Design a protein with these regions (language model features):
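Active-site neighborhoods and metal-handling regions in enzymes and metal-associated proteins
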Residues: 1-470
């Protein structure tokens, strides 16, 4: 689709209600098994006899994707061979928690306790060594082992990228003692590469869960925006958001006053003061909702150098983001989105340093096809984060960060059949973005947030939001 350049405006609206999402059922054993089978097919293509998938509290997503289990505050390791039932190796306190996995409950996943995966000084005298476990799973000098952690490396990052493995040394050292150094390689890309990683193609079940957490996160941000008042502390504002109990995908951030320049900071007992910039986010597994603006009712409350914040900064950003949305079609090279942002929002003024958009999954940042000269095409099933972060010493920032799904006709039909209420809410959000905000969307774009592209420049006047001229 071609999109004509549009000029921003500020309109007065009541924020729409799109409805609450219902917590979807857990991922079925059949879907989990399909993921394992697909991964085994990739193993076969690379002539791997075994794959080990590591997880801990921070780096859980690959493990959870394959098993429905995350190791909470322990470590865990999935050992997958070319055939047979996979083995999940866990610590003391996760031994019972493995029951969260539908694969395990149906006998399609084995479990073994390896006590060194537990917290320090807990019992460690009732499990085999990791070498014994590996040997029992058939690893030997003839094995070729792929390791999956949380990142892989390019040739310019490491001189021997395929052998650079981020898993704990005590695991990798043991694997290499058994199979040899060159027969143990980094295979994280099989799940995380933006072009072909398995987790870059979401199923209807994943979309329904991501929509659920997106609704929870965005409704919390909405409550914070409408509830904040001058004189409150940042902790008090964050408390207004509330949390639903789902695991967080990253730390809650809230910056203002002395923390304004500390982008990843959480609340630090700063007061809400008129004339200060403010940014906030809440992130669950599969979602992240963030807004940035000013504690103000109008431009009259801003510092004099920032008085043209709407026309000179945030409005221009909104205009270009409408063009960014128009490029969200299967087949668009990621480099085209990067080039749009770099050319239309020059770094010297807008300071956009990170990728202008990335993939999100259970982890807040899966990977990104959007970078300089990227020829990685967007494809159906991608969960894309509208994460384009401007930064200015004068204007601070602005943001419309939420998530969306890129879904072709077939995937939309599957979602509509399996989760009709979820699909209907996505269509309502599309209609609002198009009819009220003036943002033209490709038919493949399914917004997941309940505050889709709603950006108030001044948080003390939240019903005044950006839109585009007709």
């Amino acid at each position: 689709m071609t999109v004509r350049a549009r000029t921003h405006r500020v309109i007065q609206i009541g924020w729409p209600e799109f409805g609450q999402a219902v917590y979807p059922p857990p991922t079925s054993s059949s879907e989990l098994q399909q993921r394992v089978d697909k991964l085994r097919a990739r193993m076969d293509e690379r002539k791997l006899t075994h794959l080990v998938v590591y997880g801990d509290r921070e780096h859980f997503a690959n493990l959870a994707y394959l098993t429905g289990f995350d190791p909470r505050f322990e470590e865990a390791l999935l050992i997958l061979s070319s055939h047979g039932t996979p083995l999940l190796v866990v610590g003391n306190e996760c031994e019972a928690y493995v029951g969260v996995s539908q694969l395990f409950n149906e006998g399609k996943l084995r479990r073994e306790r390896f006590q060194p995966f537990s917290l320090l000084n807990q019992p460690r005298d009732q499990s085999r060594t990791i070498r014994e476990i590996f040997a029992a799973e058939g690893l030997n000098a003839a094995s070729r082992v792929g390791c999956v952690g949380w990142k892989y490396f390019s040739d310019h990052e490491h001189p021997n990228a395929q052998y650079a493995i981020e898993l704990p040394s005590y695991l990798v050292d043991t694997l290499r003692e058994i199979a040899g150094h060159d027969r143990v390689v980094n295979s994280t890309d099989l799940l995380m590469h933006p072009g072909y990683g398995l987790r870059t193609v979401c199923t209807p079940a994943e979309i329904a869960y991501f929509e659920y957490t997106s609704v929870q996160a965005s409704e919390s941000v909405k409550r914070m925006i409408f509830g904040m008042r001058e004189g409150m502390t940042d902790h008090e504002v964050v408390a207004l958001g509330g949390t639903c109990g789902e695991p967080l995908g990253c730390h809650v951030t809230f910056t203002t006053g002395r923390t304004s320049a500390l982008g990843l900071s959480g609340p630090k007992d700063e007061r809400i003061v008129r004339g200060q910039p403010l940014s906030m986010n809440l992130c669950y597994w599969g979602s992240n909702s963030c807004r940035s603006g000013w504690v103000a009712s109008s431009f009259h409350d801003l510092p004099v150098p920032a008085a043209d914040y709407v026309a000179g900064f945030a409005g221009a950003y909104y205009e270009v983001m409408s063009e960014w949305f128009a490029l969200l079609k299967p087949g668009t090279p990621g480099g085209q989105l990067w080039r749009l942002i770099r050319e239309r929002l020059p770094f010297e003024r807008f300071g956009i340093f990170l990728n202008p958009g990335h993939l999100i999954h259970l982890d807040e940042w899966l990977s990104s096809p959007i970078y300089a000269n990227s020829d990685v095409p967007l494809h159906s099933g991608m969960a894309i984060q509208v994460d384009v972060i401007p930064s200015s010493p004068v204007y601070a920032s602005t943001r419309m960060e939420d998530g969306l799904i890129l879904a072709d006709k077939e995937l939309r039909k599957q979602l509509s059949d399996a989760f009709p209420d979820c699909y209907a809410r996505c269509q309502k959000r599309r209609k609002f973005m198009t009819d009220v905000l003036g943002i033209e969307l490709p038919e493949e774009v399914l917004p997941l947030s309940n505050i889709p592209a709603i950006v108030p420049p001044f948080f003390l006047a939240p019903n005044e939001v950006f839109a585009l001229e007709p």
